[in-house]
C-alpha cells in the first residue's frame, strides 16, 4: 500500500512539475502575432511601400490583405479569427459571455468514499447501517431433514445484515453478536407484520445464516477501516505534506 502510494505521488509530482514549467515559458512570436517578422523592411514612418488610398496591397478600405473592413485575416467586421462581429473566439457579439456563470458544486471525494465504505445508515435504529446484499451461505445442519428444510426455505431468511462501525467494538465476537441480534429482530418484526410467522427451526437456521453473514461483514469492514487508517497516516507524514505544498506552489505560481 505504501509503495503504491509513493509511486502515485512521484508520478503526480512529475506531471505537475512539467505543467508548472510550461506555464512559465514565454509564448513565441509567429504569424499574425502583432509584431513584424522582418523589422528591417519597414521605414520609421510606416510601411516601406505605402498604399494608395490608405489601405495595404489589396486593401480597399484600410484593412489587412483580404480584409474588406479593417479586421484581421478572414475577419469581415474587425473581430478575431473566426469572430464575425468583434467578439472573442467563437463568440458572435460578446453578449453571451460564459465567464460570469457560477461553477457547479463539486462532491467531496472523501464523502463519497466514506459513504460507499460504510453503507447506508438506517433511520430509527440508533446508528446501525444496512450492509449490501449477500448470497446466502450453504450450511449443513447435521441431518437430512434440516438440510432439506433449509434449502427449501432459505429465501425467507435475511440476505443483508445490520451493523455498527467496527471501531465501536473491542473484538469480532462483540460485533457478530450484536449484528446477529439486531438483524434477526428486524427481519422477524418486518416479516411478522406481513403475516408470516417463524418456527423454532426457522429461528435456529436464521441464527446460523446471519452469523456467517455477520462474520463476512466484519472482515469486509475491518479491511476497509485498516485501509482508510493507512491512507490517513501516509498523507499526514511530513515528507508527503512538504511535497503537496510544493505542488500547490507550482500550480499557483
Curated annotation (Swiss-Prot):
Cu(2+) 3 binds at residues 77-79. One of its GO terms (molecular function) is copper ion binding. Residues 26-108 are annotated as: Disordered. Residues 23-230 are annotated as: Interaction with GRB2, ERI3 and SYN1. Residues 52-95 have a biased composition (Gly residues). A lipid is attached at residue 230 (GPI-anchor amidated serine). GO terms for cellular component: Golgi apparatus; plasma membrane; side of membrane. Residues 1-22 form the signal peptide. Cu(2+) 1 binds at residues 61-63. This is Major prion protein. The gene is PRNP.
Amino acid at each position: 500500500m505504501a509503495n503504491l502510494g509513493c509511486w502515485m505521488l512521484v508520478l503526480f509530482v512529475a506531471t505537475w512539475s512539467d505543467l508548472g514549467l510550461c506555464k512559465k515559458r514565454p509564448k513565441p512570436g509567429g504569424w499574425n502575432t502583432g509584431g513584424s517578422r522582418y523589422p528591417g523592411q519597414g521605414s520609421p514612418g510606416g510601411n516601406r511601400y505605402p498604399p494608395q488610398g490608405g489601405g495595404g496591397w489589396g486593401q480597399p478600405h484600410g484593412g489587412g490583405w483580404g480584409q474588406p473592413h479593417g479586421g484581421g485575416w478572414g475577419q469581415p467586421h474587425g473581430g478575431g479569427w473566426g469572430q464575425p462581429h468583434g467578439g472573442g473566439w467563437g463568440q458572435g457579439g460578446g453578449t453571451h459571455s460564459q465567464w460570469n456563470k457560477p461553477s457547479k458544486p463539486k462532491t467531496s471525494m472523501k464523502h463519497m468514499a466514506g459513504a460507499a465504505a460504510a453503507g447506508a445508515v438506517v433511520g430509527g435504529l440508533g446508528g446501525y447501517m444496512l450492509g449490501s446484499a449477500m448470497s446466502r451461505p450453504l450450511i449443513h445442519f447435521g441431518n437430512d431433514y434440516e438440510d432439506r428444510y433449509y434449502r427449501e426455505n432459505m429465501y425467507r431468511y435475511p440476505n443483508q445484515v445490520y451493523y455498527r462501525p467496527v471501531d465501536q467494538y473491542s473484538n469480532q465476537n462483540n460485533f457478530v453478536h450484536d449484528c446477529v441480534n439486531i438483524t434477526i429482530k428486524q427481519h422477524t418484526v418486518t416479516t411478522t407484520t406481513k403475516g408470516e410467522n417463524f418456527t423454532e427451526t426457522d429461528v435456529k437456521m436464521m441464527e446460523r445464516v446471519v452469523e456467517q453473514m455477520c462474520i463476512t461483514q466484519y472482515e469486509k469492514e475491518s479491511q476497509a477501516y485498516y485501509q482508510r487508517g493507512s491512507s490517513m497516516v501516509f498523507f499526514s507524514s511530513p515528507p508527503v505534506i512538504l511535497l503537496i505544498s510544493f505542488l500547490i506552489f507550482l500550480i499557483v505560481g
